[in-house]
Amino acid sequence: MVAPVWYLVAAALLVGFILFLTRSRGRAASAGQEPLHNEELAGAGRVAQPGPLEPEEPRAGGRPRRRRDLGSRLQAQRRAQRVAWAEADENEEEAVILAQEEEGVEKPAETHLSGKIGAKKLRKLEEKQARKAQREAEEAEREERKRLESQREAEWKKEEERLRLEEEQKEEEERKAREEQAQREHEEYLKLKEAFVVEEEGVGETMTEEQSQSFLTEFINYIKQSKVVLLEDLASQVGLRTQDTINRIQDLLAEGTITGVIDDRGKFIYITPEELAAVANFIRQRGRVSIAELAQASNSLIAWGRESPAQAPA
């Protein structure tokens, strides 16, 4: 009977000892976590410091009372600390990326904080980088378009100026050519006017301008209608010396007023431009021709005396 009682007492003492050890270990673990918790709060920086834990209420017998809701408070503090760390990391990452944007860096920042930044925040930063790159590309395209337009406008103005200068130069050359032609015609007219002198009763009388022009016209018409004229007869008809008549005919030939040839027998043969072209065509077609062949062909190509000569000018 005594043995079972001792067994019960020993079992009760063993259970009490186990409970005592369990409580002692729990208090030691709580005391060891409190310094570590204080160090973590100090490293968080900008994290708001949680309120102090309630002091332990003394228990009877001098033993401290267990803190109320200690585990819940510790978990809340850890969550707040992690949130603060994440915000600090994101702010630091964004500051780095903004600094790189100002320096012209197009790629997203890859720092030691990239592993801690959230995927959503990283996506926003990448979209911001893409928008910035698109704006820069559009601005570069606008600048290039402005440059090309300015270059085309400058080339167009240069071409317009070149055409204007060419037109002015062409007009100036045409004006000079007209003036030179008019000057030559006037000089030739004066030469002819001085050459045609009517000798009457041994006294030379110079014609007026109107008379000289009329006499020249009649002189040319007489040659054209006669076709073949003897130079001595022509000189006597117009009242000039034979040499002066020859000189006047040569001047008219040089001017292109009349066309023809002066043969070695002292005759002038007037040939129209059409007849001259027909003779030239005959020579080109036949190749080499003799004088006899040319003379024979001329009888059919040139109208010899078909027009009755007009009355010689008085």
Swiss-Prot record:
It holds the Pfam family DDRGK. Keywords: Dwarfism, Endoplasmic reticulum, Isopeptide bond, Membrane, Phosphoprotein, Transmembrane, Transmembrane helix, Ubl conjugation, Ubl conjugation pathway. One of its GO terms (molecular function) is ubiquitin-like protein ligase binding. Residues 29-314 are cytoplasmic. Residues 118-216 are annotated as: Mediates interaction with TRIP4. InterPro entries: DDRGK_dom-contain, DDRGK_domain-containing, WH-like_DNA-bd_sf, WH_DNA-bd_sf. Residues 1-114 are annotated as: Mediates interaction with CDK5RAP3. Changing residue 224 to R: Weak or no effect on ufmylation. Changing residue 121 to R: Weak or no effect on ufmylation. Widely expressed (at protein level). In the brain, highest levels in medulla oblongata, followed by cerebral cortex, cerebellum and frontal lobe. Changing residue 124 to R: Weak or no effect on ufmylation. There is a cross-link at residue 267 (Glycyl lysine isopeptide (Lys-Gly) (interchain with G-Cter in UFM1)). Ubiquitinated. Ubiquitination probably triggers proteasomal degradation and is negatively regulated by UFL1, the enzyme involved in the ufmylation of DDRGK1. Changing residue 128 to R: Weak or no effect on ufmylation. Belongs to the DDRGK1 family. This is DDRGK domain-containing protein 1. It comes from Homo sapiens (Human). The gene is DDRGK1.
